[in-house]
């Protein structure tokens, strides 16, 4: 019974310390994923603008 209490205590301490140290690299990965999303959004908006301009040119060329 005493071993179980010690095991739970050690596991709890490890979980707390690992949880605090893991936040650094998880935050970096999250920022990288967020940046990829922003670049994708910006490229999509730019692509839509170019497509709209091409459609306008095509409509003008047809008369």
Curated annotation (Swiss-Prot):
Annotated consequence of substituting residue 61 to G: In strain: Z24
Example GO BP: defense response to Gram-negative bacterium
Major subcellular site: secreted
Keywords: Amidation, Antibiotic, Antimicrobial, Immunity, Innate immunity, Secreted, Signal
Effect of residue 45 to V: In strain: MJ1
Assigned GO CC terms: extracellular region; extracellular space
Annotated phenotype, changing residue 11 to P: In strain: B226 and B316
Signal peptide (UniProt feature, chain positions): 1-23
Arginine amide modifications at: 62
Main function: Cecropins have lytic and antibacterial activity against several Gram-positive and Gram-negative bacteria. Functions in the imd/NF-kappa-B (Imd) epithelial and humoral immune response to Gram-negative bacteria.
Protein name: Cecropin-A1
High-level lineage: Eukaryota, Metazoa, Ecdysozoa, Arthropoda, Hexapoda
């Amino acid at each position: 019974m005493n071993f179980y209490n010690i095991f739970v205590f050690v596991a709890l301490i490890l979980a707390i310390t690992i949880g605090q140290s893991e936040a650094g690299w998880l935050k970096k990965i999250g920022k990288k994923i967020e940046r990829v999303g922003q670049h994708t959004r910006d490229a999509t908006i730019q692509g839509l603008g170019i497509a709209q301009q091409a459609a306008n040119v095509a409509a003008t060329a047809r008369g």
